[in-house]
A protein has these predicted regions:
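Walker A/P-loop
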Residues: 15
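Post-Walker A helix-loop "phosphate-sensing" segment adjacent to the P-loop in P-loop NTPases
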Residues: 23-30
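P-loop (Walker A) phosphate-binding loop of NTP-binding proteins
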Residues: 9
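Small-molecule kinase domains that catalyze NTP-dependent phosphoryl transfer to phosphate-bearing small molecules
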Residues: 129, 134-140, 163-166, 171-247, ...
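ATP-binding Walker
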Residues: 12
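ATP-dependent small-molecule kinase phosphotransfer cores
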Residues: 35-146
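Hydrophobic anchor at the beta1->P-loop junction of P-loop NTPases
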Residues: 6
Length: 257
């Protein structure tokens, strides 16, 4: 399996880039670090699928008003979190987390729910790697094409990028999508899940920064020029080497993709 990640601020073109690769038959699909979190929030808070995926609806006030965080609610989340992991692959103790500072906090929009539960609770108090392990567990990957290429568009933190680089080695390629308007908005962002993309940008090679300052067709040409190509497993694989063939792609080609 090959993984291509697109990092960047909100509105930079990450999901659009992944959609282009899928429409062109290069990528088989997407894997989301936030996928398990969104499913949990749908179950616990009764959110419709569209409310946790649509970028506009995420910002809308909750239909029934604000939701107040309680210890009981957080314990319920903890219990469901365990269902997404294989304890032989990854284990943590969810009962050590403190609710101090979160109890009584109001959640007013789907985005606030995802940010507070995903970052303030799970990432900062339970385990920073839970969502990584949940999204890429053996169980989660079992239904995917092992010879396919998949896109990740929500690697917002440095440890997420490093996780992909370590887990997939030569079968991983990370890009930062830069769009002028989005970079301006990023300067005003206050939440870690938005600001931390700059730390990822700092470790991505300069040649892997995609400037998305033109039309959709311009972005498409740049993406197709990267030489990304999936679904071509080689017949022999040596330890530490990629098991895929890769297309040549000028300055973007570093021998891996």
């Amino acid at each position: 399996m090959k993984i291509v990640s697109f990092t960047g601020p909100k509105g930079s073109g990450k999901d659009t880039s992944a959609d282009i690769l899928k429409k062109e038959g290069i990528a088989d699909g997407s894997i989301s670090f936030a996928g398990p979190l969104k499913k949990i929030c749908q179950e616990v808070f009764g959110l419709h699928h569209t409310l946790v995926h649509d970028p506009v609806l995420k910002e809308k006030p909750l239909k029934d008003g604000e939701i107040i965080i309680t210890p009981k609610l957080l314990r319920k989340i903890n219990q469901i979190m365990l269902d997404y992991l294989d304890p032989e692959e990854f284990y943590y103790n969810p009962n050590k987390a403190s609710v101090i500072g979160l109890e009584g906090v109001p959640l007013r929009t789907p985005r606030e729910i995802l940010q507070v539960i995903g970052t303030e609770w799970i990432r900062n108090r339970i385990h920073p790697d839970w969502h990584l392990q949940a999204a890429f567990s053996t169980k989660a990957l079992s239904s995917l094409n092992e010879d396919g290429l998949y896109c990740v568009t929500d690697a917002r933190f440095a440890n997420e990028y490093q996780f992909l680089a370590t887990k997939f080695g030569a079968d991983f390629k990370g890009f930062y999508v830069e769009r002028p308007q989005a970079e301006e908005q990023l300067a005003q962002a206050t939440h870690d899940s938005e600001r931390k993309v700059l730390e990822v940008k700092a470790i991505i090679p300069a040649e892997n920064i995609i400037l998305n300052d033109g039309s959709l067709e311009d972005l498409k040409k740049k993406l197709l020029g990267l030489g990304l190509k999936g679904n071509e497993p080689t017949t022999k694989t040596k330890k530490g080497q990629s098991k895929f063939k890769f297309a040549k792609a000028g300055k973007y080609d570093e021998g891996s993709f």
